[in-house]
Each structure stands twice: as C-alpha cells, then as structure tokens.
Swiss-Prot record:
Keywords for the protein's UniProt record, in alphabetical order: Nucleus, Ribonucleoprotein, Ribosome biogenesis, RNA-binding, rRNA processing
Species this protein is from: Branchiostoma belcheri (Amphioxus)
Name of one Pfam family that matches: Ribosomal_L7Ae
Classification of source organism: Eukaryota, Metazoa, Chordata, Cephalochordata, Leptocardii
Name the record gives this protein: H/ACA ribonucleoprotein complex subunit 2-like protein
InterPro entries in the cross-refs: eL8/uL1-like, H/ACA_rnp_Nhp2-like, Ribosomal_eL30-like_sf, Ribosomal_eL8/eL30/eS12/Gad45, Ribosomal_eL8/Nhp2
Length: 159
C-alpha cells in the first residue's frame, strides 16, 4: 500500500470554500452541529454570534492573545486573567469540562458554548480540535471583542 499524496493548501482552501456553498447549506450545517451538542451546553451562541466569535478568535490568535485548552484556561482564570471563555459543546465525555462554567461564574467571567470543537480549534490557529479558549482583550481587535462581550453577557444563563 502506498501513501496518498498530500494536498496543497490552496486546494484545501478551494475545497473548503466550495463545501461552504450557499447560505442555506451553512445554516443547515450550524443546525446539525447545534443538535449534536451535550445537554449541559447552555448558553449556546447563535449562528451569527458564533461566526463573530470565531473571527475574533482568529484575530486574537494572530496577536498570540488567547489561551487554549482546559488546563491553561483554568490556570489563568485562577491567576486572575479576564476575558471571554468559549467552550465547545460537542466535547465528550462531559466530565472533562463540566466544572468550567462554575469556575467562570465564580470569577465573574462571561462564557458561552459554541457548537464544534473542530471549528474552535481551527479559529484558534491549531490543526487539532480545542474544547476551550480564553479570549483576552487587545487594542487591535477591541471593537469586535466589545461586541462579542456584550452579546455573550446578554445570553440567558442556565438555572
């Protein structure tokens, strides 16, 4: 058996753009991802908010101004860092991150769930899925960060 040749990055981008298709396909893809989230994934960001959050995470990752992974996020929350915590809703088992919303509430840090850990990892600049990201404020993307912050804080909290 021979290995299959790797694709060029430009070919992958073209395929990704083609798979994005039209608006109806993207909405349907979000709806499918939203049905696959865990039962504790509340508050779940809406489609437009999710897209805006991913764009802000991409900007922050270029500035090296994010924390990825449960361990890092929890460590820096305990040290007093502020920001928005994004948690992937499709992470299994739930026990891996079920304590994180409580940690965020104790530190008075806003948090929300996004539907897919793969998309969150790609937005964070990683090839691997990421189940948690701490998004810190910065001057270069402050306006989009502020919009995301107001939207995340207005999401209804679970009981």
């Amino acid at each position: 058996m021979a290995k299959t040749p790797k694709k060029d990055k430009t070919e992958e981008k073209e395929e990704h753009e083609e798979s994005g298709g039209n608006k109806e396909d993207r909405e349907r893809a979000y709806e499918v991802l939203a049905t696959r989230v865990n039962p504790i994934a509340s508050p779940l960001a809406a489609r437009k908010l999710t897209k805006r959050l991913y764009k802000t995470v991409k900007k922050a990752s270029k500035e090296k101004n994010i924390r990825k992974g449960i361990r890092d996020v929890q460590k820096f929350i305990k040290k007093g860092e502020r920001g928005i915590v994004l948690i992937a809703g499709d992470t299994t088992p739930i026990e891996v991150y079920c304590h994180l919303p409580v940690v965020c509430e104790d530190a008075k840090i806003p948090y929300c769930y996004v539907p897919a850990k793969q998309d969150l990892g790609e937005a964070a600049g990683s090839k691997r899925p990421t189940c948690c990201v701490l998004l810190k404020p910065n001057e270069s993307y402050q306006s989009s960060y502020d919009e995301c912050l107001t939207d995340v804080t207005t999401l209804p909290r679970p009981i």
